[in-house]
Protein backbone atom coordinates (compact mmCIF):
# COMPACT_ATOMS: atom_id res chain seq x y z
CA UNK A 1 0.00 0.00 0.00
CA UNK A 2 1.47 3.35 -1.07
CA UNK A 3 4.90 1.75 -1.47
CA UNK A 4 4.99 0.34 2.07
CA UNK A 5 6.84 -2.91 2.54
CA UNK A 6 6.01 -5.58 5.06
CA UNK A 7 8.74 -7.14 7.13
CA UNK A 8 7.90 -10.81 6.48
CA UNK A 9 7.17 -13.00 3.48
CA UNK A 10 3.66 -14.41 3.20
CA UNK A 11 3.25 -18.00 4.33
CA UNK A 12 2.02 -20.62 1.92
CA UNK A 13 -1.76 -20.99 1.77
CA UNK A 14 -1.45 -24.64 0.70
CA UNK A 15 -2.54 -27.43 3.06
CA UNK A 16 -3.78 -25.08 5.80
CA UNK A 17 -6.37 -27.74 6.58
CA UNK A 18 -3.71 -29.72 8.43
CA UNK A 19 -2.26 -26.81 10.37
CA UNK A 20 -2.54 -27.46 14.11
CA UNK A 21 -0.62 -24.71 15.84
CA UNK A 22 -1.45 -21.12 15.00
CA UNK A 23 -1.25 -19.01 11.87
CA UNK A 24 1.26 -16.44 10.62
CA UNK A 25 4.98 -16.90 11.20
CA UNK A 26 4.57 -15.84 14.83
CA UNK A 27 1.31 -17.72 15.47
CA UNK A 28 -0.64 -14.62 16.44
CA UNK A 29 -3.90 -16.03 15.01
CA UNK A 30 -5.25 -19.13 16.72
CA UNK A 31 -7.80 -19.99 14.03
CA UNK A 32 -7.66 -19.73 10.25
CA UNK A 33 -10.84 -17.63 10.23
CA UNK A 34 -9.03 -15.09 12.47
CA UNK A 35 -6.01 -15.11 10.20
CA UNK A 36 -8.18 -14.68 7.11
CA UNK A 37 -9.36 -11.19 8.03
CA UNK A 38 -6.22 -9.81 9.69
CA UNK A 39 -4.47 -8.85 6.40
CA UNK A 40 -7.59 -6.95 5.33
CA UNK A 41 -7.19 -4.63 8.32
CA UNK A 42 -3.39 -4.40 8.27
CA UNK A 43 -2.26 -0.93 7.10
CA UNK A 44 0.69 -2.41 5.18
CA UNK A 45 -1.21 -5.28 3.55
CA UNK A 46 -4.71 -4.18 2.48
CA UNK A 47 -5.29 -1.09 4.66
CA UNK A 48 -9.05 -1.62 4.73
CA UNK A 49 -11.76 -1.88 7.35
CA UNK A 50 -14.11 -4.81 7.65
CA UNK A 51 -17.02 -2.39 7.57
CA UNK A 52 -15.92 -1.07 4.16
CA UNK A 53 -15.41 -4.59 2.82
CA UNK A 54 -18.89 -5.62 3.98
CA UNK A 55 -20.35 -2.51 2.34
CA UNK A 56 -18.55 -3.21 -0.96
CA UNK A 57 -19.65 -6.84 -1.02
CA UNK A 58 -23.25 -5.89 -0.24
CA UNK A 59 -23.28 -3.71 -3.37
CA UNK A 60 -22.42 -6.67 -5.63
CA UNK A 61 -25.28 -9.10 -6.30
CA UNK A 62 -22.78 -11.83 -7.19
CA UNK A 63 -21.58 -11.80 -3.59
CA UNK A 64 -25.02 -11.46 -1.99
CA UNK A 65 -26.16 -14.50 -4.00
CA UNK A 66 -23.08 -16.47 -3.00
CA UNK A 67 -23.52 -15.56 0.66
CA UNK A 68 -27.14 -16.70 0.44
CA UNK A 69 -26.03 -20.01 -1.07
CA UNK A 70 -23.40 -20.49 1.63
CA UNK A 71 -25.21 -19.19 4.71
CA UNK A 72 -28.93 -19.20 3.86
CA UNK A 73 -29.04 -15.41 4.06
CA UNK A 74 -27.69 -12.59 1.94
CA UNK A 75 -26.71 -10.73 5.12
CA UNK A 76 -22.97 -10.22 4.75
CA UNK A 77 -21.02 -9.86 7.99
CA UNK A 78 -17.31 -9.79 8.77
CA UNK A 79 -17.73 -13.10 10.62
CA UNK A 80 -19.28 -14.74 7.55
CA UNK A 81 -16.51 -13.30 5.40
CA UNK A 82 -13.99 -14.93 7.75
CA UNK A 83 -15.82 -18.27 7.50
CA UNK A 84 -15.96 -18.07 3.70
CA UNK A 85 -12.26 -17.23 3.47
CA UNK A 86 -11.44 -20.03 5.92
CA UNK A 87 -13.34 -22.56 3.82
CA UNK A 88 -11.67 -21.32 0.65
CA UNK A 89 -8.19 -21.58 2.16
CA UNK A 90 -8.96 -25.05 3.52
CA UNK A 91 -9.78 -26.11 -0.03
CA UNK A 92 -6.28 -25.30 -1.31
CA UNK A 93 -4.74 -28.74 -0.98
CA UNK A 94 -1.65 -30.26 -2.54
CA UNK A 95 -2.02 -33.95 -3.06
CA UNK A 96 -0.92 -34.60 -6.63
CA UNK A 97 2.42 -32.77 -6.80
CA UNK A 98 5.32 -34.62 -8.35
CA UNK A 99 6.69 -35.18 -4.84
CA UNK A 100 3.34 -36.60 -3.66
CA UNK A 101 3.27 -38.94 -6.65
CA UNK A 102 6.90 -39.93 -6.06
CA UNK A 103 6.15 -40.86 -2.43
CA UNK A 104 3.20 -42.95 -3.63
CA UNK A 105 5.44 -44.71 -6.18
CA UNK A 106 3.54 -43.20 -9.10
CA UNK A 107 6.32 -40.95 -10.43
CA UNK A 108 10.09 -40.89 -10.71
CA UNK A 109 12.47 -38.05 -10.08
CA UNK A 110 15.12 -36.83 -12.46
CA UNK A 111 18.71 -37.23 -11.32
CA UNK A 112 18.76 -33.56 -10.32
CA UNK A 113 15.53 -33.94 -8.32
CA UNK A 114 16.94 -37.02 -6.56
CA UNK A 115 20.04 -35.02 -5.60
CA UNK A 116 17.84 -32.22 -4.30
CA UNK A 117 15.86 -34.63 -2.15
CA UNK A 118 19.06 -36.18 -0.79
CA UNK A 119 20.43 -32.74 0.03
CA UNK A 120 17.17 -31.84 1.79
CA UNK A 121 16.86 -35.00 3.89
CA UNK A 122 20.47 -36.07 4.59
CA UNK A 123 22.22 -34.88 7.73
CA UNK A 124 25.00 -32.34 7.59
CA UNK A 125 28.44 -33.78 8.29
CA UNK A 126 30.96 -31.12 9.38
CA UNK A 127 33.84 -33.46 8.43
CA UNK A 128 32.61 -33.67 4.82
CA UNK A 129 30.70 -30.42 4.24
CA UNK A 130 31.09 -30.53 0.45
CA UNK A 131 29.31 -33.87 0.16
CA UNK A 132 26.92 -33.90 3.12
CA UNK A 133 23.28 -32.93 3.24
CA UNK A 134 21.69 -29.66 4.26
CA UNK A 135 19.77 -31.41 7.07
CA UNK A 136 16.47 -29.64 6.33
CA UNK A 137 14.31 -32.71 6.99
CA UNK A 138 14.77 -32.66 10.77
CA UNK A 139 12.61 -29.56 11.08
CA UNK A 140 10.81 -29.62 7.74
CA UNK A 141 9.54 -33.19 7.83
CA UNK A 142 6.25 -34.92 7.16
CA UNK A 143 3.95 -34.51 4.18
CA UNK A 144 3.66 -30.75 4.73
CA UNK A 145 7.35 -30.20 5.51
CA UNK A 146 6.41 -28.65 8.84
CA UNK A 147 6.85 -29.68 12.45
CA UNK A 148 4.07 -27.24 13.46
CA UNK A 149 6.52 -25.86 16.03
CA UNK A 150 8.03 -22.42 16.52
CA UNK A 151 11.80 -22.50 16.38
CA UNK A 152 14.73 -20.16 16.21
CA UNK A 153 17.21 -21.29 13.58
CA UNK A 154 20.06 -19.75 15.58
CA UNK A 155 21.49 -17.69 12.72
CA UNK A 156 21.08 -14.35 14.49
CA UNK A 157 22.08 -13.21 17.96
CA UNK A 158 20.35 -9.84 17.62
CA UNK A 159 16.86 -9.87 16.17
CA UNK A 160 15.27 -7.38 13.81
CA UNK A 161 12.13 -9.50 14.16
CA UNK A 162 11.22 -10.90 17.57
CA UNK A 163 8.98 -13.55 16.03
CA UNK A 164 6.88 -15.59 18.46
CA UNK A 165 8.19 -13.53 21.40
CA UNK A 166 5.88 -10.66 20.41
CA UNK A 167 2.92 -13.02 20.91
CA UNK A 168 3.96 -14.91 24.06
CA UNK A 169 6.41 -12.60 25.80
CA UNK A 170 8.57 -15.64 26.55
CA UNK A 171 12.29 -15.03 26.17
CA UNK A 172 12.67 -18.57 24.80
CA UNK A 173 10.43 -17.53 21.86
CA UNK A 174 12.59 -14.57 20.82
CA UNK A 175 13.36 -14.96 17.13
CA UNK A 176 11.28 -18.14 16.82
CA UNK A 177 9.11 -18.58 13.73
CA UNK A 178 6.69 -21.25 12.56
CA UNK A 179 8.41 -24.19 10.90
Could you tell me what each predicted segment is?
Residues 1-37, 100-179:
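Short glycine/threonine-rich turn/loop motifs
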Residues 6-12, 24-30, 42-48, 57, ...:
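Short, exposed beta-strand "edge-strand" segments with a Pro/Gly-rich flavor and a Y/T-containing core
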Residues 43-126, 141-149:
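Post-cleavage N-terminal segment of exported redox proteins
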Amino acid sequence: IDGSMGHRQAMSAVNMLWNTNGYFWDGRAEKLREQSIMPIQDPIEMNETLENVVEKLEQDTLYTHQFFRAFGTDDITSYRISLALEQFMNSIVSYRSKYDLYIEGEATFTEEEELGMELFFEEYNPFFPQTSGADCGHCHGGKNFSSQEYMNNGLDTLYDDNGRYDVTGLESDRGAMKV
